[in-house]
């Protein structure tokens, strides 16, 4: 399948201390590995970000954004359509932000400012009111809870093979005991490995994977029931309950808000 290259910003330094970028990427668009002297908050208002940042993989749903510090190499790929928003920050503005790439929880205030700026196509805050909002946004970023990664990956070959199989088949319902047999360890040992390397249980990791897969599936015309069965749920109601716990809304509500967001 052919992929389309995403154009990068064509200047060597930012035209303002805080600069905003907005785009709607279609499925199978990518930005090749690159780096720049400013820091960037990479955010998908709808869809899922797939990024490689300094050799680490990041996938983030709309409640989170990926923070890329200045001079850190990163690339981007969209498996499905993504409503993309980026906040580019001059290095002087980055001093109170993490030194390493990470995932930041996005507050409702930050979402609202980004939505407002995107609706008005504000790239450089020039009005006094917009400059104040931009400062509030920076303050929100500095206070945002830091997470290593929404869907972390393993370093050990055995565990990584399990994760990659599950990512290729998010509807796979095989229990932890099955995967323990595949890598020739006990179920208890594998459970400890999940906790040690990923910071979460097997069940939590698989649920997060399915949530990300659901967000991408909702970009298609498939029904909620079809998506539920594809992701291994025995009923639509079980899938809806999982999605609502993660997103704070039902799949249909998310889909409707996506259609509205694409109009922005």
List each model region and its residues.
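Generic protein-terminus/edge-of-domain signal
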Residues: 1-48, 263
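…primarily DNA-binding HTH/wHTH and HhH modules…
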Residues: 2-5, 241-264
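Short acidic-glycine-tyrosine-enriched beta hairpin
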Residues: 55-70
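Short hydrophobic/aromatic patch on the recognition helix
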Residues: 63, 190, 194, 238-239, ...
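Ligand-binding loop in jelly-roll beta-barrel domains
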Residues: 71-94, 99-101
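Amphipathic alpha-helical segments enriched in hydrophobic/aromatic residues interleaved with Lys/Arg
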Residues: 94-167
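Basic, amphipathic alpha-helical hairpins
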Residues: 120-125, 140-148, 162-178, 194, ...
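Terminal helix-turn-helix DNA-binding modules in bacterial transcription factors
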Residues: 177, 196-240, 256-264
């Amino acid at each position: 399948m052919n992929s389309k290259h995403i154009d990068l910003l064509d200047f060597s330094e930012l035209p303002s201390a805080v600069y905003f970028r907005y785009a709607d990427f279609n499925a199978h668009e990518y930005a090749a590995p690159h780096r720049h002297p400013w820091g960037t908050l990479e955010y998908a208002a709808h869809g899922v970000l797939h990024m490689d940042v300094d050799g680490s993989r990041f996938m983030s749903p709309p409640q989170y954004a990926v923070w890329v510090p200045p001079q850190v190499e990163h690339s981007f790929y969209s498996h499905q359509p993504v409503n993309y928003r980026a906040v580019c920050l001059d290095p002087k503005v980055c001093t109170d932000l993490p030194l390493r790439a990470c995932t930041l929880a996005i507050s409702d205030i930050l979402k609202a400012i980004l939505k407002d700026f995107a609706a008005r196509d504000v790239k450089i805050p020039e009005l006094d009111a917009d400059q104040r909002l931009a400062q509030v946004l920076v303050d929100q970023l500095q206070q945002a809870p830091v997470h290593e990664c929404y869907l972390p990956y393993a370093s050990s070959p055995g565990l990584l093979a399990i994760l990659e199989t599950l990512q290729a088949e998010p509807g796979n319902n095989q229990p932890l005991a099955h995967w323990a047999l595949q890598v020739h360890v006990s179920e208890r040992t594998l459970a400890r490995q999940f906790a040690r390397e990923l910071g979460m249980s097997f069940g939590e990791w698989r649920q997060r994977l399915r949530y990300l897969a659901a967000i991408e599936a909702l970009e298609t015309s498939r029904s909620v029931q079809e998506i539920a069965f594809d992701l291994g749920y025995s009923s639509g109601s079980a899938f809806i309950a999982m999605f609502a716990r993660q997103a704070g809304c039902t799949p249909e509500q998310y889909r409707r808000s996506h259609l509205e967001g694409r109009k922005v």
